[in-house]
Amino acid sequence: MNPLSQSALVPLRKKAKMAPISQSFCQHNVKFKEIVLFLVERKMGSSRRTFLMELARKRGFQTEIELSDSVTHIVAENNSGAEVLEWLQSKKLGFTVKTHILDISWFTECMEAGRPVEIQNRHLLPVQQDCSANFNPPLSSSCVQVSQYACQRCTTLQDTNRIFTDAFDILAEHFEFCENKGRTVAFLRASSLIKSLPFPITAMKELEGLPWLGDQMKGIIEEILEEGKSYKVLEVMNEERYKSFKQFTSVFGVGLKTSDKWFRMGFRTLEEIKNEKELKLTKMQKCGLLYYEDITSYVSRAEAETTEQLIKSIVWKFVPDAIVTLTGGFRRGKKKGHDVDILITCARKGKEKNILHNTMSVLKNRGLLLFYNIIESTFDETKLPSRHVDALDHFQKCFTILKLPKRQMDIGNIIDPHECERKNWKAVRLDLVITPYEQYPYALLGWTGSRQFERDLRRYATHEKRMMLDNHGLYDKTKNNFLKANNEEDIFKQLGLDYLEPWERNA
């Protein structure tokens, strides 16, 4: 038996080197950096697995020979979710909450399309059902442990439970309109948690042990599972106050206080607001109504990147080494958004101070500004970071409505304001934020978002690390000093957190 056993081990040693695959990997360009594949060998076989991994690399995908924390998608063939978990356990391998466990059909469709395809429910291998007791799951009936903090969860744009998160987002918005902060935060937390789950919710038992899901949230989920909809959500969407506030707050320059004032005055629609000549509006609100159709339509990634290039071309004329960064949802990988946020700094101390006013002058002279409001810096370096998780920062900034030419080639050519009179442009909301270089990593982290991610990051710093974090810096209360950071990775490290890429922060 010994000679047979030894001979059987020989080819396994040769395969372990995997030199040809490693070399091949280096030869292929990676097109989809946000995706790392791991193919389960069980029922697939070594030869087929090697072939499929090489095929994926040729298509621009990253693959891992061994399962690691970098893996985002586990692909299995002819296996159930429970079987995959059992195989991982037998190999003493694990996976994180950010990992999708998928059937080979998803992989096949990706190879045919030459790009990652959207994950559908039919692609998912449920990991919640029939979980073996041998796995010793950390939660009562859940095979996935989920942190109460969004900054400890990977949340991509692939929301497999959108029917539930959309419902919670509507209810959160409803309570925000009612100025009920407690219930607003509760539904935002619940929505954020569900967005991070790597499996579709199909039964109530899958929710056991998960944080932030109270009886009311569970009741809504159960109703949707049984009825396909939530009557509470439908009731809210039909409420007169909700519908009016939804319209009012969509106007640039209109917040909750103004919406409440208009509602108490008897206004219910934007048409009524527009037709009331005696109503006093701020300049910002007038512009918001004047360019309402453009502003409320989505900004595409192409439009956001065109705006970024426009700002870069202007800023670099004054400060060639300035750092100009597109932030917000677009930095998190979104294909569309409501506005464009751009962060500007310079490594040479003090060089950033005149950038904003100079940039506004150029835009104004080119006839590309429909509205702008500059807010000067109110930062006080003697003060500690704010204790409030929703606190605004104190950077110099400008809120604008930009007249963006629809053809990118027009950007550098427009000098005469009259050239913009024809409607060959689109009104786009643009926020420019100027930050000192030493505060740039914190500003970049804060302006990248998402809102719930940043809220939980600050809460985590306060409650778990006795630190104070905002867009200006990180203060360690145990050492009574500010901590320096050269980049976002340093901030995560100082907080003792695993680094999450921007596209993993869509909480």
Swiss-Prot record:
UniProt GO BP: DNA metabolic process; DNA modification; double-strand break repair via nonhomologous end joining
InterPro entries according to UniProt: BRCT_dom, BRCT_dom_sf, DNA-dir_DNA_pol_X, DNA_pol-X_BS, DNA_pol_b-like_N, DNA_pol_B_palm_palm, DNA_pol_lambd_fingers_domain, DNA_pol_lamdba_lyase_dom_sf
Highest taxon above the source species: Eukaryota
MF GO annotations: DNA binding; DNA nucleotidylexotransferase activity; DNA-directed DNA polymerase activity; metal ion binding
Main location: nucleus
Localization in the cell: Nucleus
Record note on cofactor: Can also utilize other divalent cations, such as Mn(2+) and Co(2+) (in vitro).
Position of sequence motif Nuclear localization signal: 11-17
Cofactor: Mg(2+)
UniProt keywords, alphabetically: Magnesium, Metal-binding, Nucleotidyltransferase, Nucleus, Terminal addition, Transferase
PROSITE patterns referenced in this protein's UniProt entry, alphabetically: BRCT, DNA_POLYMERASE_X
Involved in DNA binding: annotated span: 254-258
GO CC terms, sorted: nucleus
SUPFAM superfamilies: BRCT domain, DNA polymerase beta, N-terminal domain-like, Nucleotidyltransferase, PsbU/PolX domain-like
Binding site for Mg(2+): 339, 341, 431
Tissues in which the protein is found: Found in the thymus and not in the spleen, kidney, intestine, or liver.
Catalysis performed (reactions): DNA(n) + a 2'-deoxyribonucleoside 5'-triphosphate = DNA(n+1) + diphosphate
Annotated SMART domains: BRCT (SM00292), POLXc (SM00483)
Keyword Lyase listed: no
Enzyme Commission no: 2.7.7.31
Binding sites annotated in the UniProt record for a 2'-deoxyribonucleoside 5'-triphosphate: 329-334, 338-341, 446-447
Membrane-spanning ranges: none
Keyword Metal-binding in record: yes
Function, as annotated: Template-independent DNA polymerase which catalyzes the random addition of deoxynucleoside 5'-triphosphate to the 3'-end of a DNA initiator. One of the in vivo functions of this enzyme is the addition of nucleotides at the junction (N region) of rearranged Ig heavy chain and T-cell receptor gene segments during the maturation of B- and T-cells.
Family named by the database record: Belongs to the DNA polymerase type-X family.
Name of this chain's protein: DNA nucleotidylexotransferase
Originating species: Xenopus laevis
Organism phylogeny: Eukaryota, Metazoa, Chordata, Craniata, Vertebrata
